[in-house]
Regions:
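Helix N-cap motif at beta-to-alpha junctions
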Residues: 64-69, 113-117, 170-171
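Terminal, regulation- and interaction-focused segments at domain boundaries
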Residues: 1-12, 59-62, 104-115
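A contiguous pocket-lining binding segment that forms or flanks enzyme active sites
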Residues: 109-141
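Core RNA-modification/binding signature centered on pseudouridine synthases
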Residues: 2, 7-10, 35, 39, ...
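Ordered, amphipathic secondary-structure segments that act as subunit-interaction surfaces
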Residues: 53-109
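Short, charge-patterned binding micro-sites
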Residues: 32-61, 93
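Short amphipathic alpha-helices in soluble, non-transmembrane regions
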Residues: 69-80, 120-129, 180-182
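N-terminal, positively charged regions that mediate nucleic acid binding
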Residues: 1-42
Length: 220
């Protein structure tokens, strides 16, 4: 079963544990995990980085018996303990790729003081360039310039202080929306600092998308 859910604001920070406990409380007939047979087998979607929020998160759970999707949703809602909001439950083929492997793009909304920066181009024009550079600076002072153009499918201005970014998985790798925004604002990115963010900005992942052979995106 593919579960789409949302973590309540100011809720748990350990989503993996919250999902595991929810499945255990639900009483659903689950397949056991390989490491601990008392735990359910499940696979979470791509995790959020530090300083990011999400409107939709994903988990695939493996059941040992056929249970209607409506019943699965009802039992998970009852077992969520006020930490998670179940948005959708869908039966998917057993051999279907996990969300981790299926996701080809992610859409983020970014809100912050863009008007406080001297920007020569709109975000649309900036990311429409043939090459878009981000600068990474190490603690030793060495700088690395990286072309992040392959990772940015689209950029859109929503209002003066809010944009939307569609980021792609390119050759199995992602960049964070923080990296894209830093590039646009002309801010250097500290290399190898996973907890780094662009101060004063909020980053919300609206959803993950799979891509067909024609390049069209579909919400997972």
């Amino acid at each position: 079963m593919r579960i789409v859910f949302r973590v309540l604001k100011n809720g748990t920070t350990n989503v993996f544990k919250a999902v595991r406990e929810m499945i255990l409380r639900s009483g659903l007939p689950f397949e056991p995990a390989k490491i601990n047979k008392q735990w359910p087998r499940f696979a979470c979607g791509p995790s959020l980085a530090v300083h990011q929020q999400a409107l939709r998160e994903y988990v695939d759970i493996y059941l040992s018996a056929l249970v209607p999707a409506e019943e699965v949703q009802r039992k998970l809602e009852e077992a969520s303990a006020g930490e998670l909001v179940i948005l959708n439950v869908q039966r998917v083929p057993y051999a279907m790729p996990s969300v981790q492997n299926l996701a080809a793009a992610a859409i983020y909304s970014v809100e912050g003081p863009f008007t406080s920066f001297t920007l020569e181009q709109t975000v649309e024009n900036y990311f429409n360039a043939s090459r878009v550079e981000a600068v990474y600076r190490s603690e030793t002072g060495l700088a690395l310039t990286k072309n992040i153009k392959p990772y940015v499918l689209q950029a859109q201005t929503l209002c003066a202080d809010k944009i939307r970014l569609t980021l792609a998985c390119a050759e199995g790798k992602w960049i964070s929306p923080q990296e894209a925004v830093a590039s646009y604002l002309g801010i250097e990115i500290p290399a190898q600092q996973e907890d780094w963010t662009v101060e004063g900005f909020t980053f919300v992942r609206e959803g993950l998308y799979w891509q067909d052979s024609q390049g069209a995106l579909y919400l997972i």
